[in-house]
Amino acid sequence: MNTGLQDAYNLAWKLALVVSGRADASLLDSYEAERIPVAKRLLSTTDRAFVLIVSDSRVAGLLRTRVLANVAAFAMRFDRIRKLAFRTISQIGIEYRDSPLSEALARWHEGAPRAGDRFPWLRIKLQPDGPVEDLFAKLDDKRFHLLLFGQPALSAEIRGLRDLLVTHVVPSDPANDKELARQHIPQPSFYLLRPDGHVGLSGTQLDVAAVSGYVSDRLRMHAAK
């Protein structure tokens, strides 16, 4: 079910942009580029599991009832394994790093979100004196979102992208810094999130031309005059 939901979501936001005239139909080509590799990995895994489950050999029976059950019970004692299992089953760990929609302007240290990854769930302050909020609850899944960390706000909106892009400047704050460190998000950095929450473009200091060029190139549209 999770796979079907992700298939639908991946196609839905792209189709919405095309139907509304904000993107060229070529954007839809990225659906197969992103989702077919996921489907192949899933089928490979489920095929192996199915063979083990239906096999009537004694070895397979021992693996099912003794070995795998004990190994799973032991592994679930560890927080890291539980988190990995959750990400695998929920499929929020799926990434599109090889997608034509993924571009990185900087190389991050191990653990940092990369272009193509689903951006991590954060609870942060979006205003200096504001409350701690759920970042994903603030995101509009009909537009792109530009997240700025450890750098000042834009002096003006990125020209021509008002209807496609929302900018969020995350203020410097001890609680924010702790949350960003927990998710290995470097500062300064910027992340351009697609409507589905995956990272489309990432870098250190904001490059306005790169952001504008990314949207124009991937959506095959021209900035509004």
PLM features: residue spans?
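Helical substrate-recognition/capping region of FAD-dependent monooxygenase/halogenase enzymes
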Residues: L17-K225
